Amino acid sequence: MQAKLLGAVGALLATAFLAGPAAAAEKTKIDFWFGNSGDIAKRVQEQCDRFNQSQGDYEVVCTSQGSYDASLQNTIAAFRAGKQPTIAQVSDAGTLDIMLSGAFYPANQLMADMGYTVDWKDYFSGIANYYATSKGEMYSFPFNSSTALLYWNKDAFTKIGKDHAPATWQEAGEDFKALKDAGYACPLAFDISNNEVWQYIEQFEAVNGEAIATKKNGFEGLDAELVFNKNPLLVSYIKDLKSWYDNKLAVIKNKAVGQTFVEAFAAGDCQVILTSVGDHGNIGRTAKQGMNWGVSMLPTYGNATRHSSYVGGASLWVLKGHSDAEYKVAAAFFNFIAKPEEALTWSTVTGYIPVRNSGFEYLKKQGFYDKAPYAGRELAIQSLTASPASDTAPHGIRLGGLLQVRTEIANGLQAIFVNNADVQASLDGAADRGNQLLRRFQQTYKNVQLP
């Protein structure tokens, strides 16, 4: 059902350009729907409140939809009813779906039409390239941008004679065994849901310079095919992970077992995790008192040269079907959240990174990264910009129905770790099922050229 719904996103969005809610008498109001939940949802609401309190003409009504997936589905349903929000947050995985719908007001055009001058080159290239067209046009505003990092318990590593995090997965395997021998029951905590495909599969391919799919991971055409299963480095890595799991060097942690891997790390129960830099703030607030921990860039595999990791998180899209008065509010809101001072506040209360060079430089001048609890977050920027400008490796993933593709990959991982299925056969099956999804998406947009 979910795949059918997302597969139809283009048709639904492209034909439902109806007018939004009437403007309020005193302030011009617009709706902003976002997918974040929990602590991050509170931080988004605080940002909306700061904007609303900064002036007296506009009001942005910000409403969490509970998840990225729900945010996209609810936006589709709202178009059906002619009640679409002015701003909608769409995750990295949903970028191509909405990009091909034509149901949006391009970010660069919006800001120009509303009288704002934006230095689009100020955005970090690793972030901008993910959301830009082939001509470099920005269709949406990068918002809560992140990448994956390795979190490690420095106290535990000290007990095994180590003062640094593993730089390669081979070194990591040795560290996990040493931690186990030292009495730690959970050297590595991980999960195998569709959410974790991002850091364990996609980011692995990224930092090792390998492709998830042909056609530059889909950036060069809708006829892209998944090929991650044909990468010997990835296959060997998954076999290593399964071996660590079988030998209790790696432990699955999620809500079903009563503790997520992030919670397990913060409690000091597990010593290493891979997760978003966006979790840095939450871990800093919830970590066991006195626990000494840090972050590092993701390990590479063997002798592979390090490449840039992929940006995660989401961007903000302005939807068609609203008045110029409402679009003025949207433009003012985007201008507000782009200020370096706001970037500092946002990065302070979350773990997300500044999306612009100017914001990053402002944070450095303020000494943001000089000490705990924020030290180390700059590694996310280093990870996203590790490759030289001449690097020909893919700089992201642009596949239709990527959420469903991730689900099929997760199903393959579950077969491996839960049912002891063959690694290569399971990855091949996941790729085959994912390619079927891609072909259906391609058929939906037959003869359409990527922007």
What are these model-derived regions, one by one?
Residues 26, 137, 158-160, 239, ...:
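Extracytoplasmic/periplasmic substrate-recognition and gating elements
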Residues 50-123, 155-167, 264, 268-272, ...:
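Extracytoplasmic "Venus flytrap"/periplasmic binding protein-like
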Residues 77, 85-86, 116-156, 304-309, ...:
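A structural signal for short loop-to-beta-strand junctions that line the ligand-binding cleft
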Residues 93-147, 199-204, 294-296, 372, ...:
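Hinge/lid segment of periplasmic solute-binding proteins
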Residues 108-123, 209-236, 285-288, 299-308, ...:
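Short, solvent-exposed loop/beta-turn-alpha elements that line the ligand-binding surface or hinge
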Residues 134-143, 148, 173-226, 270:
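Extracytoplasmic/periplasmic solute-binding protein
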Residues 175-176, 182, 219-255:
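Glycine-centered hinge/linker elements that transmit conformational signals in sensory
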Residues 293-300, 348-411, 415, 445-451:
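Long, aromatic- and glycine/proline-rich binding clefts that accommodate carbohydrate-like moieties
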